[in-house]
Each structure stands twice: as structure tokens, then as C-alpha cells.
Amino acid sequence: MIDKRKLPLWLRTTPGRERGLMYSILQEYEQWCTIEMAAVMLNITNYLCYDFTKKLFECGLLDIGPDGYKLKPEYIKEVDHE
């Protein structure tokens, strides 16, 4: 689960639709994921997913690796389901 309190202020003050899409993209990146896989899962174009992923990566929210992108661990909070 994403810890929204640790996200940058600019993301939290982004207009509603754009913010919702960015949160959805971040949720896809909780596990290693490529831009193409995230775009298919969210039913958006690869270019739109690339554009938002680029913004999120440039501000330091994502790690990049051979399997795609992943949300940095400090932005993920553990949820106890007991």
C-alpha cells in the first residue's frame, strides 16, 4: 500500500484526474513492472504511461532495473491484515 503522507507535495496537490492516474500508476509499480505492462493493466496508452512514469522517476519515487520500474520501499507502508 502506498504511504500517501510521504509523497511529494506537488503530487498531492495535482488536479484530481491526473492525481488519480498517477496513484494508479504508482500502485502498478509496487511490484516490478514495465511501462507497457502498466499501460495494459490501466487501459491507457503507452505514451501517457511513459509521460507520467518519467515525471515520477525524475522526482525520485521510482527505482529502475532490468525488470522495469518499482516504487521505492520508503513510499510503501506495510498493512497488517490481522
Located regions from the model:
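Short alpha-helical segments that sit at the start of domains
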Residues: 1-23
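Short glycine/proline-centered loop/turn elements that form peptide/ligand docking sites
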Residues: 11-14, 31-34, 48-51
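Short acidic, hydrophobic short linear motifs in intrinsically disordered regions
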Residues: 29-41
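Short amphipathic alpha-helical interaction segments
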Residues: 44-57
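A short, conserved structural fragment
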Residues: 57-68
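Short, amphipathic alpha-helical interaction segments positioned at domain boundaries
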Residues: 76-82
